[in-house]
Structures are given as C-alpha cells and as structure tokens.
Amino acid sequence: MGNIFDKVNSPEDLKSLNIEDLNSLAQEVRKFIIETVADTGGHLASNLGVVELTLALHYHLNSPKDKIIWDVGHQSYTHKILTGRKKKFHTIRQYKGLSGFPKYSESIHDVIETGHSSTSISAALGLALARDLKNRNDRIYAVIGDGALTGGMAFEALNHAGHLGTDIKVVLNDNAMSISKNVGALSHYLSRIRTDPTLSKFKDDVEVLLSRIPKIGNTVSRSVERVKDGLKYLFLSGVLFEEMGFTYMGPLDGHNIQELITNFKNADNIKGPVLIHVNTKKGKGYKPAESQPSKFHGVSPFKIDNGESKRKKSNFTYSQVFGQTMVKLGNKDKKIVGITAAMPEGTGLSYFKKEFPDRFFDVGIAEQHAVTLATGMARAGMKPVVAIYSTFLQRAYDQVIHDACIQNLPVTFAIDRAGIVGADGETHHGLFDLSFLRAIPNIIIMAPKNENELQHMIYTAINNDQPVAIRYPRGEGYGVELDNDFSTIPIGKGELLCDGKDVLIIAVGSRVYPAMEAARVLSQQGIKAAVINARFIKPLDKNLILNKINECKKVITVEEHALKGGFGSAILEFINENDLRGIKVKRLGLPDRFLPHGPTGHLQTIYHIDKNAIIESALKLVDERVELGLWPGKNA
C-alpha cells in the first residue's frame, strides 16, 4: 500500500491531508477493500461506492464526539479502516473477526449498530434529542441509501425530525440501486433530480434570478422572501424533503471530496434538519462491480482479474429451486403472483419476474406493505406468494397476524435464510420465525428436508386455503433429483425415515439429514434410532409422534432455530397435553443469545446441532454410563 494509507490509522490523521492526498488515499483504500474482499468475501459494490463520501465525512467531523450512523451498515468498510481496524480488516466477517456491520463492541466510532435498513434517521434523531437535553454540541450525521429511504420507518423519522426542527444532517447516498434496482415513486423522483439536465440548469437560472430581486424595507423584504420561497417550491428540486421540514442540498458529486467537504461545512451553518443529496456509483473503481452491482452486493471470495467466484457451486440453492418452482407453477396457474420486498435476486423470485413481469411485484423495502398487499390479492382470488428472509419477516409480524391470519387468507410465506446464515451474523440469522409464528392461530408451518421436498411444499401451500409458511435455509441443497411432477403433501403428516425402539429423533428441515447420519452411526453401536422428518411444525403429526414417543420413551428434537418457543418446545407441549409420563426429552437447538457471524457449519458444530451432537445426546439418553464417559469408543 501507499505511504498515505500506511500513515492513516484514525480519523484525526486525515486532518493534515490536502485534497490531493485525500484523493490518493481514496484510491488506496479502494484497492485495499477489493484485495481483502476478494480473499474473504463480503459486501463489495456498496463499499466501493462510498469511499470518498466516508473520507469527506471523517475529514469534516470529529468522530467519536461527532456521530455517524450508517443505515444498514454493510457500506461501513472504509469507516472501519479509518477508525483503527485496518490491521484486523482481513478478518472481516470471519468467525471471531470483525463484523461486516457497525459494532459498538468493536469501536466507539460505531455509535449505533445496524444491519436492517431504514433505521438510521430514527437513531440519529434520538441521539440528537439526547444531545440537546444535555446541552451538548455533537454533530450528528445519518447516512442512508436511496433504497433504504423507501422504507416507511425512514419517512416516519424524516417527518418527526422535520416537525421538531432538530439539528441533524441526513446524507442521502443515492446510487440508484440498493441490492436490486429500486422501485416506486420515490425512486422516480430521485432519478429526475439526479439526471434531468433541464431541471438542473433551470434550478441554477432560478437561483440567479431570485438573487437579483431587490429588498426594499422590512415589510416588502418579507413579502419578497415569501414570493421567493414560493417560486423555489414551484421550480426547484428537493421539494419533497423541504415539505417535510428539511433544508435540501444537492445533488452533489459523491466522488468529489472537495465538493462534499465544502457542502458539509455549509450544512453545519444551517440550524435544523438538513438533507444532503449525494450521487455515487455503486462498485466504483472495479469494472466488474460497476457493470453488475447486484452481483457484487454480497460476494464469496473471487478472482480480481475477472470477478468470477473462487467457489464452485455443484448444487442448486434452495432459493434457486424456489424460484424455478414458482415459474413451473406460474405456467400452469395464472392466479399465482410473486411479491418481494426489494429482494428478487436473493429470494430467487427473479426467475418468476423474468417470465411473468405482470404478476411480479417488488414493493421496495416495505415488508409490512408486502404482507398486507398479499392479503388483498388473496381476498380477490389470487394466490400470492411472499418471498422474504426470515430476519425481515420480523418487520411484518403485526400484518401476518392482523391481515393474514385473523382473516385466514391463503397467503404463502416463502421464508428464505431460515436458520444460521453465516457471515452476516446477528442481524441476519433467521432464528426466531418458528417462535413467533407458532403462536398464531390459522397458520400452517412447514420445513423441507431437501430441495425436492421444498418444491412439493410450495405446490401444497399455493393450493391450500389458509396462510402457510415454509422455512428453508440459505445456500445449496443436497443435489437430490427433482421430481418432474408436483404432489400434495397431506397437511400435518410427518415422515418416518427409519424405525427403531431405543431412541426417537424428531428433526426439522436442515437437521433431518444430520439426524439420519447420526442414526446410521448409532446403529453401528447397537442402538436402533427412529428418525422422523417432522415436515410440519404446525400442525404436528400427532398420531405418528404419539405412537413413536410411547414406543421409545426417549426423545431428541433437533432444529436450526432458537430453543425458546421453537420446535422442541412444541414437542414438550405435545407431551404435556397428552399427559405422557416417563418420557425423557433432549432438545437440540440454538441458545438464548444472539449468535455471532461465522461459517455456518462451524456455528452448527459449536452450538451442538450437528450430527455429533445428536449422537452424543442419543448415547446419553440410552445409557446413563455415558455421563461418566464410559460409552463405546471413550476412555473413563
């Protein structure tokens, strides 16, 4: 790396640099990010787009006294590098390494932890109100993307801040693309401000004209100012934000450090809320990412020369199978519609979008709206499928209850990324959906053991007459052959995969295959385990489970989900409701804490939901000597 990069280890080190130095540093930082993410994987395109913006912010502000809140937070790599974490940057998103998102435990410069979108302005306003109550003078900047700005929470915060007149600055990082291309009226509005040369020139002309209007006396002056304000509202960009009580500045060139610093200084001279509109290019400085920013949003390790992944995928992912199944079903049934909240590629609905654009609806970052939109379609006789990550379904919990389940409407929830998701960590693991869905009347909850079973569950759900949720994991399936024809899975019917009388293993979703492998190993030690693929978390297969529990008396449940309120809890409730006595139960699942980031397989092992954990639990249930370490293959 260059001499400037090596010397910068804190925001304070930027203060002595001139603009030429800052521009050189930007290129060095960009190169460092590309080289590191090529080895580790991570969020690339968004970070390459905000290098100059981040440098300008830290040059202008005095962090951590002054506060920067990064919406979503996946674009905070330059911020991390500048705030003392350069030497640890090679550990980004690795187990026990740096988080890919702002983390207060890592640095006091990460004042607010983020991961989900549209939260930054609310947090910034909270910090600002506390500042004012304490009579402090901290400068508070929220950085939010144009994609995140489509989230309703962002507008709630803008409305409140504008109403209060609180002194906060909101930097709108406008790259015209969040993860996928932005949608909606706001996107079109920002696009017009950003790209319309006529509007830009007219704005300049109006400003010049208004500046020439003379002021004669206080009364006349006030009248003239009102006229000038009226003309501005008629003709100038940024009216939407001005109407909400913000002073609008921009749009600015987000890669021009001098222009950014100058305008940040000007913004600080304005008391009250200011929105600074900045245009950036996602993926800037790396041609593959510039040409395909969606592909380079979140990447696995890749080859720098061509951007191709270093990892070869051998099997279809669950998301791909979901998307392809939607296309097959959509060809046969024109009532099927697909709905997503700004994640068509991630969920696999992009396949459906390509084939049936008129039946595909991307609502932007608006999960609540997505769910209630689906209920309206269901009431009108359509068959809506809402494709959503488990972690983002949390945002629409009230709508699932109030709009879908109370009315018992046939909406299918395709819940992707259910379970451990790996490197994105606490904010993105999908560990709570069973707990919060299981408590709701009228909903059916399923989980497939493999990608073939997933397609049959989708078919079953779409042709059902009540709300159905299907949860499935991130990543590749097992490479099993996919049936050409779809079949209906009887509601509430599990699957006995192997029989035995010594111990019963009831597994859910991604844990079925490890349970089968554990049963095979146990059989080699003379222990006959029965394995049930639950398929349904709600309703349970009461007859199958009751018969096998009574027969085996020793039960293991295993799930890739939080133990509290999860599938194991459902089995305990079932045992209690049926007044079963003398039953030993061991629940395997995830603990009552937020799990860190790290490789999925590694986390499954250290949190004891892998094959070996099932084997050990079975041995302990079957033979009490195991507690003393006396089972076969172990020494006392």
From Swiss-Prot:
Domain of life: Bacteria
Gene3D superfamilies: 3.40.50.920, 3.40.50.970
Pathway where it operates: Metabolic intermediate biosynthesis; 1-deoxy-D-xylulose 5-phosphate biosynthesis; 1-deoxy-D-xylulose 5-phosphate from D-glyceraldehyde 3-phosphate and pyruvate: step 1/1
Pfam families in alphabetical order: DXP_synthase_N (PF13292), Transket_pyr (PF02779), Transketolase_C (PF02780)
InterPro entries linked: Dxylulose-5-P_synthase (IPR005477), THDP-binding (IPR029061), Transketo_C/PFOR_II (IPR009014), Transketolase-like_Pyr-bd (IPR005475), Transketolase_BS (IPR020826), Transketolase_C (IPR033248), Transketolase_CS (IPR049557)
Biological process per Gene Ontology, one example term: 1-deoxy-D-xylulose 5-phosphate biosynthetic process
Cofactor: Mg(2+); thiamine diphosphate
Keywords: Isoprene biosynthesis, Magnesium, Metal-binding, Thiamine biosynthesis, Thiamine pyrophosphate, Transferase
Textual note on the cofactor: Binds 1 Mg(2+) ion per subunit.
EC code(s) of this entry: 2.2.1.7
Catalytic function, reaction form: D-glyceraldehyde 3-phosphate + pyruvate + H(+) = 1-deoxy-D-xylulose 5-phosphate + CO2
CDD domains linked to this entry: TPP_DXS, TPP_PYR_DXS_TK_like
Molecular function (Gene Ontology), one example: thiamine pyrophosphate binding
Residues annotated for Mg(2+) binding in this entry: 146, 175
A single cellular component GO annotation: cytosol
Residues that, per the record, bind thiamine diphosphate: 74, 115-117, 147-148, 175, 286, 367
Family: Belongs to the transketolase family. DXPS subfamily.
Function summary: Catalyzes the acyloin condensation reaction between C atoms 2 and 3 of pyruvate and glyceraldehyde 3-phosphate to yield 1-deoxy-D-xylulose-5-phosphate (DXP).
Subunit architecture: Homodimer.
HAMAP family: DXP_synth
Name of the protein in question: 1-deoxy-D-xylulose-5-phosphate synthase
Organism of origin: Halothermothrix orenii (strain H 168 / OCM 544 / DSM 9562)
Gene behind the chain: dxs
